Amino acid sequence: MNIYTNPEVEKFILALEKQTVAKVIRTVDLLEKFEHKLGLPHSKKVSKDLFELRIRGKQEIRLFYCFHNKSIHLLHGFVKKSQKIPQKEMRLALQRLKLLDTQ
């Protein structure tokens, strides 16, 4: 399955520390390999069509993604600082998901 990365997500990932980037790449590789079957602790469904890729470490990194047209799309990334997903981050991911649906 192909993985498409939003340019903003790519910038976000490349700005992280090298060690964290390696963990992100490893986790994205797991997503590519296991697709829908990838579950906790690496992936969690957060809404009907939106999933959260969870990268644990010195920083808690979250990447929102979806499955669309037999591909995986990485929509948004952020550093998680609290227990709940910030609404601002969720809204942005849902907006990008909506854009995919209109294409």
Language-model segments: what does each one mean?
Residues 57, 64-67:
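Short glycine/proline-enriched loop/turn "hinge" motifs that connect secondary-structure elements
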Residues 62-63, 76:
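Short, conserved beta-strand/beta-arch hydrophobic-aromatic motifs that form part
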Residues 1-59, 71-72, 81-103:
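Basic, Lys/Arg-enriched alpha-helical interface segments
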